UniProtKB/Swiss-Prot annotation:
Binding site for a divalent metal cation: 246-247, 270
Database matches in InterPro entries: Aminoacid_DH-like_N_sf (IPR046346), Malic_enzyme_CS (IPR015884), Malic_N_dom (IPR012301), Malic_N_dom_sf (IPR037062), Malic_NAD-bd (IPR012302), Malic_OxRdtase (IPR001891), NAD(P)-bd_dom_sf (IPR036291), NAD_malic_enz_proteobac (IPR023667)
Primary gene name: maeA
Species in which this protein is naturally found: Pectobacterium atrosepticum (strain SCRI 1043 / ATCC BAA-672)
Protein's name in the database: NAD-dependent malic enzyme
Enzyme type, top EC level: oxidoreductase
Site residues (Important for activity), renumbered to this chain: 270
PANTHER family according to UniProt: MALIC ENZYME-RELATED (PTHR23406), NAD-DEPENDENT MALIC ENZYME, MITOCHONDRIAL (PTHR23406:SF34)
Gene3D superfamilies membership: Malic enzyme, N-terminal domain, NAD(P)-binding Rossmann-like Domain
Pfam families linked: malic, Malic_M
Residues annotated to bind NAD(+): 157, 270, 418
Cofactor: binding details: Divalent metal cations. Prefers magnesium or manganese.
GO cellular component: cytosol
UniProt entry keywords in alphabetical sequence: Metal-binding, NAD, Oxidoreductase
Length: 565
């Protein structure tokens, strides 16, 4: 159980002068008091005025508004993060709706593509394959000693943009910023990591400014041995850390998750986090439509690790609502670039083979039996839910959506691919094609849709609703693993926060301005599930709630006292 975070207790600091001003976790800038300026040899290094954090945030907000392009805003915010982290999070706290798309999706995708061009200052760890013999030393070199949450990527599948090499570091940095801004996890406890195993992206290899290892990606046994060296080193350095895998390629994501989820407290946000927020959204949407998830039929476009992860969680939820395994699987249809997954298709991946439809059940379908398209699935299976995780734009066509609407009065349509340029259909089109009847959730942010004098808020099915609460719940409860039951608890807690399901109006998911309260609610249910499943010490619900509240970091300056090294 984590100890209370006492914001009133002074920090004893050994640093002084310019060194203190260069330490982003400790720097207060113009907010250092007169006493602190004298004690820490800061006289003459700062303007005369002593400011509050609110005054600093107001100046930063005005400066932010001067930038016209999102990537410029991203670079500006990252610069604040790298100079004064408390101010950075205070600024986010006041403008989260505006700034979340800037620090994370969709703008972070552009930042990853141009990582080597916009690079300013080191953050996190760059662990390269040529330096694999020194991984233990690298972890010792981390600027933060008490690391409790690591987000790691190898940069191979960055959003819908593919292989970005070490440019993928933008994702762990952005993800951990949301762990703090949304989940209250102190930035002193977080560490972004990129595993530099080369890149197969010719644009990166041929870029004279590319800062990563200029080499084709290592693969197979060589790759897995390197990842294992990293995992074992992490276990030696921080044995109780929460490790999140992020944006690994489909061929590696599931094997790595399966290999390490019972060895270290870990999860894969692309597979499990995406599934958890999707399930929460679907439970809420089903309630809003007056049904249960067990009553729905689901069609997927995209049968990669993320899509199949969502599908498996849908099946688990349907089973919890009373369906048998066979009945639940018969209600889920997976379509990829080769068509509907059936038991006749060769060369399926292990996680895909569990989700095939039996050919004999499709015998009376009116379709091309060799490659059954999404449109043919919609005509024959008559899905009530359609989920896009294909990474390809525009594939939810007007014909497909209108065909779905013919047999479903309240279709649930979730084009989840991101960034925005990769979305399967735009919400305004889906609303128009269904005459305002569809319930829509997207993976990227979209403005509300105006249709026939009505305003339709568009829920962003954003993993940020889930993973900060999971992280907070793990830290507060002291859980040593993340179980399927904990993930399902997170989904149900999110559904319970749905304005549309609870009030019959509003958005499918809570407003981002409420995300800290949502994270606390999810953390409580995740912590309870961890205790029930034997991966955390059992305490009372009241004690768990107090641990969550006490561990929820706030961006406020603490007083400093001088000490020696």
């Amino acid at each position: 159980m984590e100890l209370e975070y006492e914001s009133k207790r002074p920090l004893y600091i050994p640093y002084a002068g310019p060194i203190l001003l260069e330490f982003p976790l400790l720097n207060k800038g113009s907010a250092f008091t007169e006493e602190e300026r004298a004690d820490f040899n800061l006289a003459g290094l700062l303007p005369e005025a002593v400011e509050t954090i609110e005054e600093q945030a107001e100046r930063a907000w005005r400066q932010y508004q001067e930038f016209k392009h999102d990537i410029e805003k991203h670079v500006y915010l990252r610069n604040i993060q790298d100079t004064n982290e408390t101010l950075f999070y205070r600024l986010l706290d006041g403008h989260l709706n505006e700034m979340m798309p800037i620090i994370y999706t969709p703008t972070v995708g552009e930042a990853c593509e141009h990582f080597s061009d916009i690079y300013r200052r080191a953050r996190g760890l760059f662990i390269s394959y040529p330096n694999r013999a020194n991984i233990d030393d690298m972890l010792q070199n981390a600027t933060k000693q008490n690391v409790k949450v690591i987000v790691v990527t190898d940069g191979e599948r960055i959003l819908g943009l593919g292989d970005q090499g070490i440019g993928g570091m933008g994702i762990p940095i952005g993800k951990l910023a949301l762990y703090t801004a949304c989940g209250g996890i102190s930035p002193a406890y977080t560490l972004p990591v990129v595993l530099d195993v080369g890149t197969n992206n010719p644009q990166r290899l041929n870029d004279p400014l590319y800062m990563g290892w200029r080499h084709p990606r290592i693969t197979d046994d060589e790759y897995y041995a390197f990842v294992d060296e990293f995992i074992q080193a992490v276990k030696r350095r921080w044995p109780n850390v929460l490790l999140q895998f992020e944006d690994f390629a489909q061929k590696n994501a599931t094997p790595l998750l399966n290999r390490y989820r019972d060895e270290i407290c870990s999860f894969n946000d692309d597979i499990q986090g995406t599934a958890a927020v999707a399930i929460g959204s679907l439970i809420a949407a089903s309630r809003a439509a007056g049904t249960q998830l067990r009553d729905q039929t689901v069609a997927f476009l995209g049968a990669g690790s993320a899509g199949c992860g969502i599908a498996e969680q849908i099946i688990a939820q349907m089973k919890s609502e009373g369906l048998s395994e066979e009945e639940a699987r018969a209600r889920v249809f997976m379509v990829d670039r080769f068509g509907l997954l059936t038991d006749k298709l060769p060369n399926l991946l292990d996680f895909q083979s569990k989700l095939v439809q039996k050919s004999e059940l499709l015998a009376d379908w009116d379709c091309n039996s060799d490659a059954i398209s999404l449109l043919e699935v919609v005509r024959n299976a008559k899905p009530t839910i359609m989920i896009g995780v294909s990474g390809q734009p525009g594939l939810f066509t007007e014909e497909i959506i209108r065909e779905m609407y013919k047999h479903c009065a309240r279709p649930i349509v979730m084009p989840l691919s991101n960034p925005t340029s990769r979305v399967e259909a735009r919400p305004e089109d889906i609303i128009r094609w269904t005459e305002g009847s569809a319930l829509v959730a997207t993976g990227s942010p979209f403005s509300p849709v105006h249709y026939q004098d009505k305003v339709f808020p568009i829920a962003q099915c954003n993993n940020s609703y889930i993973f900060p609460g999971i992280g907070l719940g793990v830290l507060a409860s002291g859980a040593n693993r993340i179980t399927d039951g904990m993930l399902m608890a997170a989904s149900r807690a999110l559904a319970d926060c749905s304005p549309l399901a609870n009030n019959g109006e509003g958005a499918l998911l809570p407003d981002l301005s409420d995300i800290q309260q949502v994270s606390k609610r999810i953390a409580l249910d995740v912590g309870k599930a961890a205790q029930l499943q034997g991966v955390a010490v059992v305490t009372s619900a009241d004690a768990l709630q107090k641990a969550i509240d006490h561990n929820f970091w706030q961006p406020q300056y603490r007083s400093y006292k001088r000490t020696s090294f």
